[in-house]
Amino acid sequence: NKNRCQIVGNRGNALIYSLSGWSFTRTSSKVIDDMDWGGVLRLNNSDLLESADGVLSFDGSGHTVTINGFPNNNITISNRADFARAALIMQHDSNVFVKYSGASRADMLAANISLSADVDISDTGLTGFMRDNGEDTFTGTLTGNSHKLTMTVGTENDKIVFHTHNGLFAKTSGAKISDLTIVSNFNIVGDNVSGGDACYIGSVSAYNSGALTIDKVTADVTASPSGAYTNFVGGLVGYVADATSEVSFTNSAVTANLTYNNSTTKVDCTCLGGVIGMVGAVTSKPAPVIKFDNVTVGGKITDKHTGSNSRVGGLIAEVGAKDNSASVVPNKVSI
């Protein structure tokens, strides 16, 4: 009802949102989320509205939601309502329950996004643009126009539990991110079972395959993963997968404060890197080139993992080796 929340859709494609005065207190006995991606979107009575010209509108007779869509995939984001609209479309197919017109989900995953103002999505329930279980890949562009994007993921009673891909973009391939300041804080509870799902965390991209261009990006990143299984955490990118295309970081600065406090862990691994958590083993030719040009990295990395698989690096925590060797080319790097 008007004082609580709506659940619209079906398993795997549901939208859950609250209107105002909503909160959730997680019990100490709960160790896993029932949903494996997303969170509860928190609308309000000011800038995140349930209305035809707001984020979305609700039809009580059919129990359906219409998201305020975009005419095409050239997107300008001027406030957090615009961000929410774009994120909802990236995460939901248009169907009988959740509808929108204009740019499709596929269009949005290849969008050209531009910021026209600073945007803070903290306390909205949004965990980034995309689903954080890594089903889809962003292939478009994001131009910050010197604006700042702030996000906080996993507050005390809104922790992200067992969600695998955590970042502004869950997965990227061929994406270009430029002229952006990003401030992000991740409090993520990863998988606690050996052999379970790895947890990927990166302020820009949790997991990248293929090319990636990051230019003129300033990132202030705090991340505190706590799962006992594998954690790949990077100031900008959590994991770079096997690829044959260049991944470049230019004219950028990262302050990465990364902490792993689970001192009881002796198996599996952690990779905490100032820019990249891990570059995966290369199985194809030509081997990828990871290029750093005019990059400054600062902050503090603390890893209390007590096993032999603890990896820490100022730029990259680990570069995997298999059939070929990835080339890491640093130029004008300060750590």
Where are these regions (language model features)?
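Surface-exposed repetitive/solenoidal architectures
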Residues: 1-335
